[in-house]
Amino acid sequence: MQPYSEGTFDDVAKYKFEQTEDDLEAAKLLLEAGKYKAANNRAYYSCFHAIDAVLAKEPVAFKKHKDTLSYFNKNYVHTEIFPRDIGRKISRLEIIRHKSDYDTFYIASKEDAAEQVSVAEEVIDLVRKYLELNN
């Protein structure tokens, strides 16, 4: 049995980013399987975990998604650490995920799900580069 270690903030960021990659892979598999609502969900969470990985470096953490996204937009998008259009794309990801999870009458399309996965890939690529530069 190894002694308990809390790790570093870099360890937390790495762990969160691993979740990101797992969620993105799941989103792609679900898209291919025609499970568009589930693909939307995983695409959103892949981005959310990527954002969490960025914030883990500070370190800050929030209990609510809206607070996490608001902080990220204020401190990383509005300051142009990340491109401004990414904030809008993440906002759309959140809206589509919410519809997919909670709107009984929302019908997810292949096109929307493919767009969600594409945006997730874009965000994750930007976060990967950011984490590499700020490691």
Name what the model sees in each region.
Residues 1-135:
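Terminal alpha-helical segments
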